[in-house]
UniProtKB/Swiss-Prot annotation:
Pfam families from the UniProt entry: PNP_UDP_1
Annotated CDD domains: MTAN
Taxonomic placement: Bacteria, Pseudomonadati, Pseudomonadota, Gammaproteobacteria, Pasteurellales
Annotated positions binding substrate: G78, I152, M173, E174
Stated name of the protein: 5'-methylthioadenosine/S-adenosylhomocysteine nucleosidase
Key words of the record: Amino-acid biosynthesis, Hydrolase, Methionine biosynthesis
GO cellular component, one term: cytosol
Lineage: superkingdom: Bacteria
Catalytic activity: S-adenosyl-L-homocysteine + H2O = S-(5-deoxy-D-ribos-5-yl)-L-homocysteine + adenine; S-methyl-5'-thioadenosine + H2O = 5-(methylsulfanyl)-D-ribose + adenine; 5'-deoxyadenosine + H2O = 5-deoxy-D-ribose + adenine
Organism in which the protein naturally occurs: Haemophilus influenzae (strain PittGG)
Amino acid sequence: MKIGIVGAMAQEVEILKNLMADRTETRVASAVIFEGKINGKDVALLQSGIGKVAAAIGTTALLQLAKPDCVINTGSAGGVAKGLKVGDIVISDETRYHDADVTAFGYEKGQLPANPAAFLSDKKLADLAQEIAEKQGQSVKRGLICSGDSFINSEDKITQIQADFPNVMGVEMEATAIAQVCYAFNVPFVVVRAISDGGDGKASMSFEEFLPLAAKQSSTLVLGMIDRL
C-alpha cells in the first residue's frame, strides 16, 4: 500500500518530510510531492499550497503521479465546535464547502453541481484515526469540517457558517477541495486536523503562535496511522 498525505503549508508537512527515507522530490506548478518511506511504509507527501485551487491542483498531481491507495489530509484548523481547544484533533466524517452557493438552482448550501452536498470520509480511515488519537491520549472530536477560501477570524463569520452548518466542528481552507478530487478519482480519504485557533477575533495571533503545536499533534496522529496501514 502507498499512503498519500496532503498538507498545505511547509510547517504542516515538515515533521513527516524529515522522517522520510530515500526521499525524492517532484514539483508540479506550485505543489511539491515528496516520495519515500516512513517507518518502512511507502508514502507520497504533498505540500499543496494554501487554498482550494492549490489543494485541488496538488491533489490531482499526487493521485496521477504517485497513485496512492488512500489520502490523509493533515494540518491545522480553526475550532468552532463547543469545547474544542488549541491542540485538540478533529477528524472528518464529512466535508463541505461553506462558501459555495448554487441554491438558486435547487442545490443545498455548499453543494456544487454534479457533486454531492457532502464528501464522506472513508469510515475505516476515520475509525483508525480516532482509535489512534485516543490511544495517544489526544483529545479528539469527529464530524463535519467546512472549507472556504477565507481565514475565519471573527465571531460574525463563525455565526454565519454555523447558521448554514449547525454541526460544523472545524473550518479551514483545503480539505473539501482535496475530498472532491479524491471523490472524482474514487480514492478513499480522511481529514485529520489539529486546532490552531478559535476562528474568532484573536484567530490570527493564535494561529501564528500555535501552528507548530497543531502541526506536531496532527503529524503524530498521522505517524500512528502510517504504522497501521
